[in-house]
């Protein structure tokens, strides 16, 4: 999903950076407030960031100028909400661009928009919707992570199609081509990420029940927080 350094036209790179900036600024405020009011959450924040960094560094070759990999953003979005995940995702993408040559600085805005903004919001939206319908927690976690991953690649396909429309069929033709190529690797990766996120969440339920209760992850059917609901 990481679009390579220098691959996007300058105007596109700037536009995606401008579009991403307000979300990241808002996320910094949310993260600062979270750490100030709940300093005990720093360990879980670090774990969420590390989960994203490790998973998104496992890249497979895909469309020219990009690659396929898990994103790892669904977990952090479920735990701390999408604004904070925008910051954790941006830090992840920046370090990967500088240390791993994965992505790039000129394409940072585009990569942030797809992986650190749209992915977490889409995944969190599905997670919250399923929770409202009283779907078991681990099922909602799976679909939240699955959608966060898959929606990231949908946005990347849009970004590439906007930058490089097909000479004959234009934007829609390019979108279909980019999306279909990504789908070959990304759908299995999204399923795998969903299952892995469920495993991690089960471990967190066993080790950090109090923190998950405070964050609102452990809820009863009536909306009250409770720990035993996760056993389903």
From Swiss-Prot:
Pfam family, one: CbiM
InterPro entries: CbiM, CbiM/NikMN
Membrane-spanning parts: 6-26, 43-63, 84-104, 107-127, 135-155, 181-201
Main location: membrane
Subcellular compartments: Cell membrane
GO cellular component: ATP-binding cassette (ABC) transporter complex
Keywords: Cell membrane, Cobalamin biosynthesis, Cobalt, Cobalt transport, Ion transport, Membrane, Transmembrane, Transmembrane helix, Transport
Pathway the protein takes part in: Cofactor biosynthesis; adenosylcobalamin biosynthesis
Keyword Transport: yes
Membrane topology classification: Multi-pass membrane protein
GO biological process, one term: cobalamin biosynthetic process
Presence of the UniProt keyword Ion transport in the record: yes
Function: Part of the energy-coupling factor (ECF) transporter complex CbiMNOQ involved in cobalt import.
Family classification: Belongs to the CbiM family.
Subunit annotation: Forms an energy-coupling factor (ECF) transporter complex composed of an ATP-binding protein (A component, CbiO), a transmembrane protein (T component, CbiQ) and 2 possible substrate-capture proteins (S components, CbiM and CbiN) of unknown stoichimetry.
Protein name according to UniProt: Cobalt transport protein CbiM
Species assigned in the record: Streptomyces coelicolor (strain ATCC BAA-471 / A3(2) / M145)
């Amino acid at each position: 999903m990481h679009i390579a350094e220098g691959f996007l036209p300058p105007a596109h790179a700037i536009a995606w950076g401008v579009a991403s900036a307000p979300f990241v600024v808002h996320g910094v405020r949310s993260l600062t407030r979270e750490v100030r009011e709940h300093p005990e959450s720093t360990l879980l924040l670090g774990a969420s960031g590390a989960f994203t960094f490790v998973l998104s560094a496992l890249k497979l070759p895909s469309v020219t100028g990009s690659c396929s990999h898990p994103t790892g953003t669904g977990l952090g979005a479920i735990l701390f909400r999408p604004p904070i995940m925008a910051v954790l995702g941006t830090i992840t993408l920046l370090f990967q661009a500088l240390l791993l040559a994965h992505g790039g600085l000129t394409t940072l805005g585009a990569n942030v928009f797809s992986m650190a903004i749209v992915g977490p919001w889409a995944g969190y939206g599905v997670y919250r919707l399923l929770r409202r319908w009283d779907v078991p927690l681990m099922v909602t976690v799976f679909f939240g992570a699955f959608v966060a991953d898959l929606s990231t690649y949908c946005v990347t396909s849009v970004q590439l199609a906007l930058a490089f429309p097909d000479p004959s069929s234009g934007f829609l033709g390019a979108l279909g081509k980019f999306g279909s190529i990504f789908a070959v690797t990304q759908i299995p990766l999204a399923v795998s990420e969903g299952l892995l996120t469920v495993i991690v969440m089960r471990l967190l339920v066993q080790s950090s029940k109090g923190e998950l209760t405070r964050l609102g992850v452990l809820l009863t059917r009536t909306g009250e927080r409770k720990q035993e609901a996760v056993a389903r």
